[in-house]
Amino acid sequence: METNQLFSLDNLITILPECVLIICLLTILMIDVITKKSVWLSNIALLGLLTSTFILLFQLTNNEVGFTAFLGSFQVDGFTIAFRCLLTLSSALCIPLSTEYIRRSGMTQAEFLILLLTATLGGMFLCGANDLVTIFVSLECLSLSSYLLAGQAKKDIRSNEASLKYLLMGGASSSILVYGFSWLYGLSGGELQLSKIVNGISSQDIYLSSAVSLDGKTFGALGLWVAFVCILVGIGFKISAVPFHQWTPDVYEGSPTPVVAFLSVGSKAAGLALATRLLSIVFPAIEDQWHIVLEIVAFLSMVFGNLIAATQTSMKRMLAYSSISQAGYLLIAILVGNSDGYASMITYLLIYTFMNLGAFACTVIFGLRTGTDQIRDYTGLYLKDPWLAFALSICLLSLAGMPPLAGFFGKLYLFWCGWQSHLYLLVYTGLITSVISLYYYLRVVKAMMTKEVKEMSTYVREYVTPSMSIFSSSSIELGLTLCVLASSILGFFMNPLIDVTKQSMLVNNFLVF
Protein backbone atom coordinates (compact mmCIF):
# COMPACT_ATOMS: atom_id res chain seq x y z
CA MET A 1 0.00 0.00 0.00
CA GLU A 2 1.56 3.30 -1.09
CA THR A 3 1.06 6.04 1.48
CA ASN A 4 1.56 8.82 -1.07
CA GLN A 5 -1.21 7.44 -3.25
CA LEU A 6 -3.51 6.88 -0.29
CA PHE A 7 -3.30 10.50 0.89
CA SER A 8 -3.12 12.14 -2.51
CA LEU A 9 -4.88 15.42 -3.21
CA ASP A 10 -7.36 13.70 -5.53
CA ASN A 11 -8.44 11.36 -2.75
CA LEU A 12 -8.87 14.22 -0.28
CA ILE A 13 -10.94 16.20 -2.79
CA THR A 14 -13.12 13.12 -3.23
CA ILE A 15 -14.08 13.20 0.46
CA LEU A 16 -14.09 17.00 0.75
CA PRO A 17 -17.68 17.01 2.16
CA GLU A 18 -16.60 14.60 4.89
CA CYS A 19 -13.49 16.69 5.58
CA VAL A 20 -15.70 19.75 6.12
CA LEU A 21 -17.75 17.84 8.70
CA ILE A 22 -14.62 16.58 10.45
CA ILE A 23 -13.34 20.16 10.75
CA CYS A 24 -16.71 21.28 12.16
CA LEU A 25 -16.71 18.36 14.59
CA LEU A 26 -13.23 19.22 15.89
CA THR A 27 -14.15 22.92 16.09
CA ILE A 28 -17.22 22.16 18.20
CA LEU A 29 -15.16 19.90 20.43
CA MET A 30 -12.48 22.54 21.00
CA ILE A 31 -14.98 25.35 21.64
CA ASP A 32 -16.83 23.20 24.16
CA VAL A 33 -13.61 22.31 25.98
CA ILE A 34 -12.25 25.86 26.04
CA THR A 35 -15.28 28.08 26.65
CA LYS A 36 -18.20 25.82 27.64
CA LYS A 37 -20.43 28.26 25.74
CA SER A 38 -22.81 26.70 23.24
CA VAL A 39 -24.24 29.80 21.56
CA TRP A 40 -22.66 29.13 18.16
CA LEU A 41 -22.30 25.37 18.24
CA SER A 42 -25.55 24.62 16.41
CA ASN A 43 -24.76 27.25 13.79
CA ILE A 44 -21.30 25.76 13.20
CA ALA A 45 -22.75 22.27 12.73
CA LEU A 46 -25.53 23.55 10.48
CA LEU A 47 -23.09 25.58 8.37
CA GLY A 48 -20.83 22.56 7.95
CA LEU A 49 -23.70 20.29 6.90
CA LEU A 50 -25.08 22.82 4.41
CA THR A 51 -21.59 23.41 2.98
CA SER A 52 -21.14 19.67 2.53
CA THR A 53 -24.54 19.47 0.84
CA PHE A 54 -23.65 22.17 -1.69
CA ILE A 55 -20.29 20.51 -2.41
CA LEU A 56 -22.07 17.21 -3.05
CA LEU A 57 -24.61 18.90 -5.33
CA PHE A 58 -21.73 20.38 -7.31
CA GLN A 59 -20.09 16.95 -7.58
CA LEU A 60 -23.41 15.42 -8.63
CA THR A 61 -23.64 17.75 -11.62
CA ASN A 62 -19.98 17.20 -12.50
CA ASN A 63 -19.56 14.56 -15.19
CA GLU A 64 -16.03 13.67 -14.16
CA VAL A 65 -17.03 11.34 -11.33
CA GLY A 66 -17.45 7.60 -11.50
CA PHE A 67 -14.28 6.10 -10.06
CA THR A 68 -12.78 4.53 -6.95
CA ALA A 69 -10.55 6.32 -4.44
CA PHE A 70 -8.33 5.29 -1.54
CA LEU A 71 -6.94 2.27 -3.38
CA GLY A 72 -10.39 1.08 -4.38
CA SER A 73 -11.99 1.19 -0.94
CA PHE A 74 -14.31 4.14 -1.69
CA GLN A 75 -16.64 4.33 -4.69
CA VAL A 76 -17.52 7.71 -6.19
CA ASP A 77 -20.52 7.81 -8.51
CA GLY A 78 -23.83 9.60 -8.87
CA PHE A 79 -25.65 7.09 -6.69
CA THR A 80 -23.15 7.46 -3.84
CA ILE A 81 -23.13 11.25 -4.03
CA ALA A 82 -26.94 11.44 -4.05
CA PHE A 83 -27.20 9.34 -0.89
CA ARG A 84 -24.45 11.29 0.86
CA CYS A 85 -26.36 14.45 -0.03
CA LEU A 86 -29.54 13.00 1.49
CA LEU A 87 -27.65 12.25 4.71
CA THR A 88 -26.23 15.75 5.08
CA LEU A 89 -29.61 17.29 4.27
CA SER A 90 -31.47 15.17 6.83
CA SER A 91 -28.87 15.91 9.51
CA ALA A 92 -29.04 19.62 8.72
CA LEU A 93 -32.82 19.58 9.16
CA CYS A 94 -32.48 17.71 12.47
CA ILE A 95 -30.43 20.51 14.05
CA PRO A 96 -33.28 23.09 14.12
CA LEU A 97 -35.51 20.36 15.57
CA SER A 98 -33.09 19.75 18.41
CA THR A 99 -32.13 23.24 19.64
CA GLU A 100 -35.13 23.96 21.85
CA TYR A 101 -35.52 20.30 22.81
CA ILE A 102 -31.95 20.14 24.09
CA ARG A 103 -32.40 23.28 26.15
CA ARG A 104 -35.64 22.05 27.74
CA SER A 105 -34.52 18.47 28.39
CA GLY A 106 -31.14 19.30 29.89
CA MET A 107 -29.16 17.41 27.24
CA THR A 108 -25.60 18.50 26.43
CA GLN A 109 -25.67 20.36 23.13
CA ALA A 110 -22.01 19.83 22.19
CA GLU A 111 -22.26 16.12 22.89
CA PHE A 112 -25.41 15.80 20.80
CA LEU A 113 -23.91 17.68 17.85
CA ILE A 114 -20.65 15.72 17.95
CA LEU A 115 -22.51 12.42 17.94
CA LEU A 116 -24.86 13.60 15.18
CA LEU A 117 -21.95 14.67 12.97
CA THR A 118 -20.11 11.42 13.70
CA ALA A 119 -23.17 9.37 12.77
CA THR A 120 -23.53 11.43 9.58
CA LEU A 121 -19.88 10.82 8.70
CA GLY A 122 -20.30 7.09 9.27
CA GLY A 123 -23.37 7.03 7.04
CA MET A 124 -21.64 9.01 4.29
CA PHE A 125 -18.62 6.71 4.22
CA LEU A 126 -20.97 3.73 4.31
CA CYS A 127 -22.75 4.95 1.18
CA GLY A 128 -19.49 4.87 -0.79
CA ALA A 129 -17.73 1.95 0.92
CA ASN A 130 -16.38 -0.48 -1.65
CA ASP A 131 -14.68 -3.14 0.48
CA LEU A 132 -15.71 -5.23 3.47
CA VAL A 133 -13.44 -3.51 6.01
CA THR A 134 -14.57 0.00 5.04
CA ILE A 135 -18.20 -1.12 5.13
CA PHE A 136 -17.89 -2.55 8.63
CA VAL A 137 -15.91 0.38 10.09
CA SER A 138 -18.33 2.92 8.57
CA LEU A 139 -21.34 0.93 9.75
CA GLU A 140 -20.01 0.78 13.30
CA CYS A 141 -19.26 4.51 13.24
CA LEU A 142 -22.90 5.13 12.35
CA SER A 143 -24.25 2.50 14.74
CA LEU A 144 -22.25 3.37 17.86
CA SER A 145 -23.08 7.06 17.47
CA SER A 146 -26.76 6.16 17.05
CA TYR A 147 -26.74 4.05 20.24
CA LEU A 148 -25.28 6.97 22.18
CA LEU A 149 -27.73 9.43 20.63
CA ALA A 150 -30.65 7.23 21.68
CA GLY A 151 -29.51 7.51 25.30
CA GLN A 152 -28.82 11.25 25.30
CA ALA A 153 -31.68 12.01 27.71
CA LYS A 154 -29.74 10.47 30.58
CA LYS A 155 -32.32 11.39 33.23
CA ASP A 156 -35.13 9.69 31.31
CA ILE A 157 -35.36 5.98 32.04
CA ARG A 158 -37.13 5.40 28.72
CA SER A 159 -34.15 6.84 26.86
CA ASN A 160 -31.76 4.63 28.80
CA GLU A 161 -33.90 1.59 28.04
CA ALA A 162 -34.10 2.50 24.35
CA SER A 163 -30.33 2.93 24.14
CA LEU A 164 -29.69 -0.44 25.80
CA LYS A 165 -32.16 -2.28 23.55
CA TYR A 166 -30.72 -0.60 20.49
CA LEU A 167 -27.17 -1.49 21.55
CA LEU A 168 -27.92 -5.15 22.27
CA MET A 169 -29.94 -5.79 19.12
CA GLY A 170 -27.64 -3.68 16.97
CA GLY A 171 -24.59 -5.50 18.28
CA ALA A 172 -26.20 -8.85 17.50
CA SER A 173 -27.10 -7.79 13.96
CA SER A 174 -23.58 -6.44 13.35
CA SER A 175 -22.11 -9.75 14.51
CA ILE A 176 -24.31 -11.66 12.06
CA LEU A 177 -23.36 -9.23 9.29
CA VAL A 178 -19.65 -9.74 9.94
CA TYR A 179 -20.18 -13.49 9.88
CA GLY A 180 -21.66 -13.08 6.41
CA PHE A 181 -18.64 -11.01 5.38
CA SER A 182 -16.34 -13.80 6.58
CA TRP A 183 -18.11 -16.21 4.22
CA LEU A 184 -17.63 -13.81 1.30
CA TYR A 185 -13.97 -13.38 2.21
CA GLY A 186 -13.43 -17.13 2.31
CA LEU A 187 -15.44 -17.98 -0.80
CA SER A 188 -13.59 -15.35 -2.86
CA GLY A 189 -10.16 -16.60 -1.86
CA GLY A 190 -9.31 -13.71 0.46
CA GLU A 191 -10.63 -10.69 -1.46
CA LEU A 192 -12.01 -7.56 0.21
CA GLN A 193 -13.15 -5.28 -2.62
CA LEU A 194 -16.69 -5.99 -3.78
CA SER A 195 -15.92 -6.37 -7.49
CA LYS A 196 -12.97 -8.65 -6.74
CA ILE A 197 -15.14 -10.74 -4.42
CA VAL A 198 -17.50 -11.51 -7.31
CA ASN A 199 -14.63 -12.50 -9.58
CA GLY A 200 -13.04 -14.54 -6.82
CA ILE A 201 -16.23 -16.45 -6.04
CA SER A 202 -16.96 -17.24 -9.68
CA SER A 203 -13.43 -18.58 -10.20
CA GLN A 204 -13.41 -20.86 -7.16
CA ASP A 205 -14.19 -24.55 -7.61
CA ILE A 206 -16.08 -24.44 -4.30
CA TYR A 207 -18.81 -22.39 -5.98
CA LEU A 208 -19.71 -25.17 -8.38
CA SER A 209 -19.09 -28.01 -5.95
CA SER A 210 -21.44 -26.58 -3.31
CA ALA A 211 -24.29 -25.65 -5.64
CA VAL A 212 -27.74 -26.69 -4.52
CA SER A 213 -29.78 -28.37 -7.24
CA LEU A 214 -33.52 -29.00 -7.04
CA ASP A 215 -35.38 -30.57 -9.98
CA GLY A 216 -32.45 -29.81 -12.24
CA LYS A 217 -32.32 -26.12 -11.28
CA THR A 218 -29.10 -24.76 -9.78
CA PHE A 219 -29.64 -22.47 -6.81
CA GLY A 220 -26.07 -21.21 -6.38
CA ALA A 221 -23.43 -21.92 -3.81
CA LEU A 222 -24.64 -22.89 -0.37
CA GLY A 223 -21.91 -20.74 1.17
CA LEU A 224 -23.07 -17.77 -0.88
CA TRP A 225 -26.58 -18.28 0.46
CA VAL A 226 -25.28 -18.31 4.03
CA ALA A 227 -23.49 -15.02 3.33
CA PHE A 228 -26.62 -13.52 1.77
CA VAL A 229 -28.87 -14.46 4.69
CA CYS A 230 -26.42 -13.03 7.24
CA ILE A 231 -26.02 -9.81 5.28
CA LEU A 232 -29.80 -9.53 4.86
CA VAL A 233 -30.21 -9.73 8.64
CA GLY A 234 -27.67 -6.96 9.21
CA ILE A 235 -29.09 -4.64 6.57
CA GLY A 236 -32.71 -5.46 7.43
CA PHE A 237 -32.04 -4.31 10.98
CA LYS A 238 -30.60 -1.03 9.71
CA ILE A 239 -33.58 -0.18 7.51
CA SER A 240 -36.22 -1.53 9.95
CA ALA A 241 -37.58 -4.16 7.58
CA VAL A 242 -39.77 -7.03 8.79
CA PRO A 243 -38.84 -9.39 10.45
CA PHE A 244 -35.82 -7.41 11.69
CA HIS A 245 -37.86 -4.49 12.98
CA GLN A 246 -38.41 -5.44 16.63
CA TRP A 247 -36.17 -2.69 17.97
CA THR A 248 -37.89 0.11 16.08
CA PRO A 249 -41.06 0.88 18.14
CA ASP A 250 -39.35 0.80 21.54
CA VAL A 251 -36.32 2.80 20.41
CA TYR A 252 -38.48 5.38 18.63
CA GLU A 253 -40.75 5.79 21.65
CA GLY A 254 -37.98 6.06 24.25
CA SER A 255 -35.32 8.07 22.40
CA PRO A 256 -35.29 11.89 22.26
CA THR A 257 -37.53 12.93 19.37
CA PRO A 258 -34.82 14.79 17.37
CA VAL A 259 -32.71 11.62 17.54
CA VAL A 260 -35.64 9.55 16.28
CA ALA A 261 -36.05 12.00 13.39
CA PHE A 262 -32.45 11.34 12.33
CA LEU A 263 -32.71 7.57 12.75
CA SER A 264 -35.90 7.44 10.67
CA VAL A 265 -34.22 9.06 7.67
CA GLY A 266 -30.42 9.07 7.94
CA SER A 267 -29.94 5.51 9.15
CA LYS A 268 -32.48 4.19 6.64
CA ALA A 269 -30.84 6.02 3.72
CA ALA A 270 -27.39 4.67 4.58
CA GLY A 271 -28.76 1.14 4.96
CA LEU A 272 -30.54 1.29 1.60
CA ALA A 273 -27.39 2.54 -0.13
CA LEU A 274 -25.43 -0.35 1.36
CA ALA A 275 -28.12 -2.87 0.44
CA THR A 276 -28.24 -1.67 -3.16
CA ARG A 277 -24.48 -1.82 -3.60
CA LEU A 278 -24.01 -5.22 -1.97
CA LEU A 279 -26.95 -6.96 -3.62
CA SER A 280 -26.30 -5.59 -7.09
CA ILE A 281 -22.55 -6.27 -7.07
CA VAL A 282 -21.90 -9.32 -4.90
CA PHE A 283 -24.89 -11.60 -5.51
CA PRO A 284 -25.62 -11.65 -9.27
CA ALA A 285 -25.20 -15.44 -9.31
CA ILE A 286 -28.30 -15.93 -7.15
CA GLU A 287 -30.18 -12.83 -8.28
CA ASP A 288 -33.40 -14.62 -9.20
CA GLN A 289 -33.53 -16.31 -5.81
CA TRP A 290 -32.64 -13.33 -3.61
CA HIS A 291 -35.26 -11.33 -5.47
CA ILE A 292 -37.86 -13.76 -4.13
CA VAL A 293 -36.56 -13.38 -0.57
CA LEU A 294 -36.49 -9.59 -0.82
CA GLU A 295 -40.00 -9.54 -2.28
CA ILE A 296 -41.22 -11.44 0.79
CA VAL A 297 -39.46 -8.98 3.11
CA ALA A 298 -40.94 -6.00 1.23
CA PHE A 299 -44.43 -7.54 1.30
CA LEU A 300 -44.27 -8.26 5.05
CA SER A 301 -42.89 -4.79 5.80
CA MET A 302 -45.69 -3.03 3.93
CA VAL A 303 -48.48 -5.17 5.38
CA PHE A 304 -47.23 -5.56 8.94
CA GLY A 305 -46.05 -1.96 9.29
CA ASN A 306 -49.34 -0.42 8.21
CA LEU A 307 -51.63 -2.85 10.05
CA ILE A 308 -49.83 -2.43 13.38
CA ALA A 309 -49.52 1.35 12.92
CA ALA A 310 -53.31 1.53 12.77
CA THR A 311 -53.54 0.19 16.35
CA GLN A 312 -51.07 2.58 17.98
CA THR A 313 -52.00 5.27 20.50
CA SER A 314 -48.60 6.99 20.65
CA MET A 315 -47.60 9.32 17.84
CA LYS A 316 -43.95 8.21 17.94
CA ARG A 317 -44.85 4.51 17.87
CA MET A 318 -47.24 5.15 15.00
CA LEU A 319 -44.47 6.88 13.06
CA ALA A 320 -42.16 3.97 13.93
CA TYR A 321 -44.45 1.42 12.30
CA SER A 322 -45.02 3.85 9.45
CA SER A 323 -41.24 3.88 8.96
CA ILE A 324 -41.29 0.08 8.73
CA SER A 325 -43.88 0.22 5.95
CA GLN A 326 -41.87 2.89 4.13
CA ALA A 327 -38.91 0.49 4.10
CA GLY A 328 -41.12 -1.99 2.26
CA TYR A 329 -41.98 0.59 -0.39
CA LEU A 330 -38.32 1.49 -0.90
CA LEU A 331 -37.30 -2.15 -1.30
CA ILE A 332 -39.37 -2.19 -4.49
CA ALA A 333 -36.79 0.15 -6.03
CA ILE A 334 -33.93 -2.24 -5.20
CA LEU A 335 -35.88 -5.08 -6.82
CA VAL A 336 -36.39 -3.01 -9.97
CA GLY A 337 -32.61 -2.83 -10.28
CA ASN A 338 -32.22 -0.30 -13.09
CA SER A 339 -31.71 3.45 -13.44
CA ASP A 340 -35.45 4.10 -13.13
CA GLY A 341 -35.65 2.11 -9.91
CA TYR A 342 -32.66 3.78 -8.30
CA ALA A 343 -33.87 7.22 -9.38
CA SER A 344 -37.29 6.51 -7.86
CA MET A 345 -35.64 5.42 -4.59
CA ILE A 346 -33.51 8.56 -4.34
CA THR A 347 -36.40 10.84 -5.29
CA TYR A 348 -38.79 9.22 -2.83
CA LEU A 349 -36.16 9.35 -0.07
CA LEU A 350 -35.74 13.09 -0.71
CA ILE A 351 -39.48 13.65 -0.37
CA TYR A 352 -39.66 11.27 2.60
CA THR A 353 -36.93 13.29 4.34
CA PHE A 354 -39.05 16.43 4.33
CA MET A 355 -42.44 14.92 5.13
CA ASN A 356 -41.15 12.61 7.87
CA LEU A 357 -38.95 15.24 9.53
CA GLY A 358 -41.87 17.66 9.28
CA ALA A 359 -44.07 15.20 11.17
CA PHE A 360 -41.40 14.76 13.83
CA ALA A 361 -40.94 18.54 14.08
CA CYS A 362 -44.65 18.87 14.89
CA THR A 363 -44.30 16.07 17.44
CA VAL A 364 -41.36 17.89 19.05
CA ILE A 365 -43.25 21.19 19.23
CA PHE A 366 -46.40 19.62 20.65
CA GLY A 367 -44.39 17.57 23.12
CA LEU A 368 -42.47 20.60 24.36
CA ARG A 369 -45.70 22.54 24.92
CA THR A 370 -47.74 19.73 26.46
CA GLY A 371 -45.37 16.97 27.59
CA THR A 372 -47.27 14.19 25.79
CA ASP A 373 -47.19 12.35 22.47
CA GLN A 374 -50.46 10.42 22.78
CA ILE A 375 -52.66 10.75 19.70
CA ARG A 376 -55.83 11.37 21.75
CA ASP A 377 -54.17 14.41 23.33
CA TYR A 378 -54.01 16.14 19.93
CA THR A 379 -57.81 16.49 19.94
CA GLY A 380 -58.88 20.07 19.25
CA LEU A 381 -55.38 21.35 18.46
CA TYR A 382 -56.67 23.33 15.48
CA LEU A 383 -58.63 25.61 17.82
CA LYS A 384 -55.49 26.54 19.76
CA ASP A 385 -52.72 26.36 17.15
CA PRO A 386 -54.06 26.27 13.57
CA TRP A 387 -50.60 26.45 12.00
CA LEU A 388 -49.23 23.43 13.86
CA ALA A 389 -52.37 21.41 13.12
CA PHE A 390 -52.21 22.37 9.45
CA ALA A 391 -48.48 21.57 9.20
CA LEU A 392 -48.87 18.14 10.81
CA SER A 393 -51.85 17.38 8.57
CA ILE A 394 -49.87 18.22 5.44
CA CYS A 395 -46.92 16.04 6.46
CA LEU A 396 -49.10 13.08 7.47
CA LEU A 397 -51.24 13.22 4.34
CA SER A 398 -48.09 13.44 2.23
CA LEU A 399 -46.77 10.32 3.99
CA ALA A 400 -50.05 8.61 3.11
CA GLY A 401 -49.63 9.57 -0.54
CA MET A 402 -52.58 11.92 -0.91
CA PRO A 403 -52.61 13.98 -4.13
CA PRO A 404 -51.48 16.60 -4.93
CA LEU A 405 -48.86 16.43 -2.17
CA ALA A 406 -45.27 15.38 -2.85
CA GLY A 407 -45.66 11.95 -1.26
CA PHE A 408 -48.26 11.02 -3.89
CA PHE A 409 -45.91 11.73 -6.80
CA GLY A 410 -43.04 9.95 -5.06
CA LYS A 411 -45.09 6.79 -4.55
CA LEU A 412 -46.57 7.06 -8.03
CA TYR A 413 -43.14 6.96 -9.68
CA LEU A 414 -41.94 4.22 -7.33
CA PHE A 415 -44.95 2.01 -8.05
CA TRP A 416 -44.76 2.75 -11.77
CA CYS A 417 -41.15 1.49 -11.83
CA GLY A 418 -42.26 -1.63 -9.97
CA TRP A 419 -45.09 -2.21 -12.45
CA GLN A 420 -42.72 -1.83 -15.41
CA SER A 421 -40.51 -4.52 -13.84
CA HIS A 422 -43.51 -6.88 -13.44
CA LEU A 423 -43.57 -6.63 -9.63
CA TYR A 424 -47.35 -6.68 -9.74
CA LEU A 425 -47.93 -8.25 -6.32
CA LEU A 426 -45.76 -5.68 -4.56
CA VAL A 427 -47.35 -2.78 -6.43
CA TYR A 428 -50.87 -3.97 -5.57
CA THR A 429 -49.77 -4.49 -1.97
CA GLY A 430 -48.27 -1.01 -1.88
CA LEU A 431 -51.48 0.54 -3.20
CA ILE A 432 -53.69 -1.34 -0.74
CA THR A 433 -51.47 -0.63 2.26
CA SER A 434 -51.29 3.04 1.27
CA VAL A 435 -55.06 3.12 1.55
CA ILE A 436 -54.80 1.45 4.96
CA SER A 437 -52.30 4.09 6.04
CA LEU A 438 -54.89 6.76 5.30
CA TYR A 439 -56.91 5.42 8.22
CA TYR A 440 -54.37 6.07 10.94
CA TYR A 441 -53.06 9.30 9.41
CA LEU A 442 -56.58 10.71 8.99
CA ARG A 443 -57.39 9.64 12.54
CA VAL A 444 -54.80 12.14 13.78
CA VAL A 445 -56.00 14.82 11.37
CA LYS A 446 -59.63 14.31 12.39
CA ALA A 447 -58.74 14.58 16.08
CA MET A 448 -56.85 17.83 15.54
CA MET A 449 -59.51 19.41 13.35
CA THR A 450 -62.47 18.89 15.69
CA LYS A 451 -64.29 22.15 16.37
CA GLU A 452 -66.14 21.01 19.47
CA VAL A 453 -64.64 22.72 22.50
CA LYS A 454 -66.08 20.07 24.81
CA GLU A 455 -64.11 17.37 22.95
CA MET A 456 -60.82 19.21 23.34
CA SER A 457 -58.22 17.23 25.29
CA THR A 458 -57.00 18.40 28.68
CA TYR A 459 -53.53 19.04 27.30
CA VAL A 460 -54.85 21.21 24.47
CA ARG A 461 -57.03 23.18 26.91
CA GLU A 462 -53.87 24.13 28.79
CA TYR A 463 -51.91 24.65 25.58
CA VAL A 464 -50.03 27.95 25.41
CA THR A 465 -50.95 29.48 22.07
CA PRO A 466 -47.95 31.03 20.27
CA SER A 467 -48.23 34.56 18.95
CA MET A 468 -47.00 34.22 15.34
CA SER A 469 -46.25 30.60 14.57
CA ILE A 470 -45.78 30.83 10.83
CA PHE A 471 -43.35 33.73 10.94
CA SER A 472 -41.71 32.77 14.21
CA SER A 473 -37.96 33.19 14.52
CA SER A 474 -37.81 29.88 16.38
CA SER A 475 -35.43 27.55 14.55
CA ILE A 476 -37.70 24.54 14.89
CA GLU A 477 -40.68 26.35 13.36
CA LEU A 478 -38.55 27.69 10.53
CA GLY A 479 -37.42 24.12 9.85
CA LEU A 480 -41.03 22.96 10.03
CA THR A 481 -42.09 25.61 7.52
CA LEU A 482 -39.43 24.40 5.09
CA CYS A 483 -40.56 20.78 5.48
CA VAL A 484 -44.21 21.70 4.93
CA LEU A 485 -43.41 23.68 1.79
CA ALA A 486 -41.28 20.86 0.40
CA SER A 487 -43.94 18.25 1.25
CA SER A 488 -46.52 20.38 -0.56
CA ILE A 489 -44.80 21.52 -3.75
CA LEU A 490 -41.84 19.20 -4.35
CA GLY A 491 -44.04 16.80 -6.28
CA PHE A 492 -44.60 19.39 -8.99
CA PHE A 493 -40.88 19.27 -9.77
CA MET A 494 -40.70 15.49 -10.08
CA ASN A 495 -39.63 15.40 -13.73
CA PRO A 496 -36.55 17.62 -13.26
CA LEU A 497 -35.60 15.71 -10.10
CA ILE A 498 -35.92 12.34 -11.81
CA ASP A 499 -34.07 13.49 -14.92
CA VAL A 500 -31.14 14.86 -12.92
CA THR A 501 -30.93 11.71 -10.80
CA LYS A 502 -31.12 9.31 -13.75
CA GLN A 503 -28.65 11.30 -15.80
CA SER A 504 -26.10 11.47 -12.99
CA MET A 505 -26.21 7.70 -12.50
CA LEU A 506 -25.97 6.90 -16.21
CA VAL A 507 -23.15 9.39 -16.82
CA ASN A 508 -21.23 8.13 -13.81
CA ASN A 509 -21.68 4.49 -14.82
CA PHE A 510 -23.30 3.40 -11.58
CA LEU A 511 -24.87 0.48 -13.38
CA VAL A 512 -21.53 -0.73 -14.72
CA PHE A 513 -19.27 -1.94 -11.95
Swiss-Prot record:
Where would you find this protein in the cell?
Plastid, Chloroplast thylakoid membrane
Which protein family is named in the record? Belongs to the complex I subunit 2 family.
One GO BP annotation here? photosynthesis, light reaction
Q: What is its main location?
A: plastid
NCBIfam families documented for this protein: NDH_I_N, PRK02504.1
Q: Does the keyword DNA-binding apply?
A: no
Enzyme kind, highest EC tier: translocase
What's this protein's function? NDH shuttles electrons from NAD(P)H:plastoquinone, via FMN and iron-sulfur (Fe-S) centers, to quinones in the photosynthetic chain and possibly in a chloroplast respiratory chain. The immediate electron acceptor for the enzyme in this species is believed to be plastoquinone. Couples the redox reaction to proton translocation, and thus conserves the redox energy in a proton gradient.
Could you list the residue ranges that cross the membrane?
Answer: 11-31, 38-58, 78-98, 112-132, 133-153, 167-187, 219-239, 256-276, 290-310, 318-338, 348-368, 389-409, 422-442, 478-498
Matching Pfam families, A to Z? Ndh2_N (PF19530), Proton_antipo_M (PF00361)
- One Gene Ontology cellular component annotation held by this UniProt entry: chloroplast thylakoid membrane
Give the lineage.
Eukaryota, Viridiplantae, Streptophyta, Zygnematophyceae, Zygnematophycidae
Put simply, this protein is called: NAD(P)H-quinone oxidoreductase subunit 2, chloroplastic
Q: What is its EC number?
A: 7.1.1.-
Q: To which species is this protein native?
A: Staurastrum punctulatum (Green alga)
